[in-house]
Amino acid sequence: MERVKVIDSIMGSGKTTYIIKMMNEAPKNEHFIFITPYLDEVTRIKRSCTNRKFYEPKIHSEEGETLYKLDSLHKHLADNNDIVTTHALFSMANETTKELIYSGNYTLILDETMEVVKKLNISKDDLDMLFQNEWIKNNNGTIIWNDEQERNLNREYKGEFQTLKHLAKSKNLILHNESVLFWQFPADIFAQFKQVYNLTYLFDAQIQKYYYDINGIEYELYAVVKDNDSYKLMQHSRQFDKAKKDVLRHKIKIYEGDLNKIGDDYYALSKNWFEKRSVLHKRLKNNILNYYQNILKSKSKGNLWTTFKSHKSKLSGKGYTKGFLACNIKATNEYSHKRSLVYSINRFVNPAIDDYFRSKGIIINEDNFALSEMIQWIWRSAIRNGQDINIYVPSSRMRKLLMDWLENQR
């Protein structure tokens, strides 16, 4: 496999348009898999690729047999069809998927980065129980399912950890510090493709960048640049974003006033702050209410806000509660009419994931990660359509990151 071509360009710069043109002009004997988090992008690819037909794997019946989505994906791969589907389905890839991709000579288009490392919610007690009952084995840090135990007992495991069983059989589970279990997307799948394109923005801030690093996956950075009526790829430079940021700087109106005092501390509005400074929850809620009702005088239908889901109820208030959008949501364009935003959160990498990468000698840049997550969230709003927005960012750290980015200092 050639190096992954990471097309790192700001939102709305033409990444998908460039790729659609590339696929339309490719010889018929080339085959593509387009993976996206957005359902409406699935529709766009199917409509826009007029010179080739893209198939979307779905649950359906064939000759009296129910084909689930992964089965459907495998059938399309076996038929050498061009395929468009979601991150969720692609994350289920197994050994059969890899073999079919390799033999089909496919090119992968990965729209946005995926969740490639995820901490599983399983207690150490449950983990110890699975080891003691010999359902799982530790193979140099990789957790594998013990098929021999099922044969010895003459029965198939049907307990509550069947999802874990499926992941372990795919050899995608990693044990960290003898107590934390991670699922990792199978890194060797990328080597099965003829070529891989990764469309994203601020790639250096993405967990997938660090995942590539620990798995020895080589990549090179490009940017999409407007070329008359078309687009072309060029070696990546941050300066390509400057013109877009100059426009955005005048369209994103960041609140600066006394309501920001609550977030002066570097760690204010972090997960730890919410758990330990409950006395300040009501003040933050009143600040949000004040911002919407008195400063903006905005209508409920135009309000969009976020915080940690576990603390949502403590900040919810009249006129904006229904406008909540989780801070890590990327796969939606349903909020593109929202123009009054509150970003009441201070993002840091999950400590367990941070510790896992540190154990591999990789240090995640927390500020880049936080900035990327915030920009992705803001981009769910009306700014994606070129409309002006107002935003209250109480955290001094997050606010400075946003301002520095708009000034092209990040």
Swiss-Prot record:
Task: Classify the source by domain of life.
Answer: Bacteria
Q: What is this protein called?
A: SPbeta prophage-derived uncharacterized protein YonV
